[in-house]
Amino acid sequence: MFKLRIYKLSGAYKGNLDHEEFFSTREEMETRYNELFVYENYSLNPTAWENVGGQWKRLEEF
């Protein structure tokens, strides 16, 4: 299982977690990540995670 953590892009809570989206395959997650990614947003872009052994591990290449 994979997930994207989506962050608020503006307002008083800018940079805080907005919501998470879950995916059964890495390919689905990558497709959605590419839809959301904006180079100019830098650290506000989504972060990608994989569930390994019941714990979430961040995927560094995203």
Language model features by range: what are they?
Residues M1-L17:
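Short aromatic-glycine-(Arg/Gly/Cys) micro-motifs in beta-strand/loop hairpins
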Residues I6, E20, E27, R58-L59:
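Positively charged, low-complexity intrinsically disordered regions
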Residues K3-I6, R26, E35, W49:
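Low-complexity, intrinsically disordered short peptide segments enriched in small/polar/basic residues
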Residues E35-F62:
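Short, mixed-charge low-complexity intrinsically disordered segments
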